[in-house]
């Protein structure tokens, strides 16, 4: 019984800490990659970051976590379409859109959808990155997207 209680306390403590983690808003990380789509190798840039959401007074009230896949070496990038994709949230992050069907890389799975060994990722031959850039957005309180408390530690309305 002591072991069960100790495990319960450990998980409760870790859950409480993870809910209070602060992620710096208005930051991004950029990396370069290659993938194969419809038999053609292409280079792309992946950018993840936190986008602030402001109220009418100009105060940041939330931060949205996003991942932006941008195809490199495009002649007229100003006219390139952008697909914005998001799950309903909260509780359902955009990870399955990234890693299951739309993103440039997908999980290694068999025909029935079960993971295969060695675990990992492979190029997504059906990604739309060849024709449009993709932005995945996690709604507030999903994944890393969060409301930002005010100076009194109260959440905005």
Name each model feature, range by range.
Residues 1-20:
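Bacterial Sec-dependent N-terminal signal peptides
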Residues 14, 38, 50, 141-143:
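Generic hydrophobic/packing signal
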């Amino acid at each position: 019984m002591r072991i069960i209680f100790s495990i319960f306390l450990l998980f409760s403590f870790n859950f409480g800490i993870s809910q209070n983690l602060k992620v710096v808003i208005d930051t991004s990380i950029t990396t370069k990659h290659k993938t194969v789509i419809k038999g053609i190798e292409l280079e792309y840039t992946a950018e993840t970051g936190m986008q602030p959401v402001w109220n009418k007074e100009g105060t940041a009230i939330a931060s949205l976590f996003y991942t932006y896949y941008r195809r490199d070496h495009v002649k007229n990038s100003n006219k390139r379409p952008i697909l914005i994709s998001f799950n309903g949230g909260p509780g359902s992050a955009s990870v399955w859109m990234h890693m299951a069907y739309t993103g440039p890389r997908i999980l290694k799975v068999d025909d029935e959808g079960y993971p295969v060994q060695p675990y990992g990722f492979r190029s997504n031959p059906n990604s739309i990155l060849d024709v449009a850039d993709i932005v995945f957005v996690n709604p507030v309180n999903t994944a890393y997207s969060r409301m930002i408390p005010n100076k009194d530690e109260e959440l905005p309305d």
